[in-house]
Amino acid sequence: MHPLAMPAAMAAVAAHEQGKFWEYHDKLFANQPRFQPDQLLQYAREVGLDVNRFKAALDGGRGRPSINADMAETNALGVTGTPAFFINGRFLSGARPFNDFAQMINAELQRLNIPLPPAAAAQGGR
């Protein structure tokens, strides 16, 4: 796990508690390659969070139990990074071209004897 993953996840949970998860998420991802833990409060200010509530949530570790549960579940499923996808229980790891998804979905439809959509059938299941 990336060393900043837990602080970033806890900050996102703290932002969610104030109804600004997506704003905070977008700020984190816009600065992902270079952000530092001390910038988490700065980002909270920038997206309009109550910084005292935000800091209290971080200091109290309120998000940690749910984050740890999510991490345990992903580890049990064999997920080692992002992005990760499951299509009808089949694991697909990493950023993939659309065709990889289409092939897996069509293979699952065929395995379950579900007719392919007309466009997929016309392309031979691709």
Task: Enumerate the predicted regions with their spans.
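Structural microenvironment flanking redox-active thiols in thiol-disulfide oxidoreductases
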Residues: 1-44
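C-terminal cap of thioredoxin/glutaredoxin-like
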Residues: 39-126
